[in-house]
């Protein structure tokens, strides 16, 4: 049986999910598409409960004390770190992949 990790979304990541939904449903007037995308993001994040090391390490952050990884979902990127000792995965950010998000972490 696979070891399960606890998933923790930061307040910022939660807000970013809400912002993604609002933008797509209101600005683009595509509520169903917004719902589908949020569901897909959530399903992919849930996958990290059992396979947190399945995504690539963010090379630009290798010099930092904490190791960050990225989960790519469509045009979005979930940035997270793994706390092996406490079996937790912290979802730090959920951002549009087309922007320079590396400077914002």
Q: Where do the model's predicted regions map?
A:
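Arg/Lys-rich, positively charged N-terminal/basic patches that mediate binding to nucleic acids
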Residues: 1-40
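Generic alpha-helical hydrophobic packing signal
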Residues: 21-24, 44, 68-70
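Enriched for short, Lys/Arg-rich terminal
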Residues: 28, 73-77, 81-105
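Compact soluble domain cores
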Residues: 40-49
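Basic/aromatic recognition patch in beta-strand/loop cores that engages polyanionic ligands
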Residues: 53-85
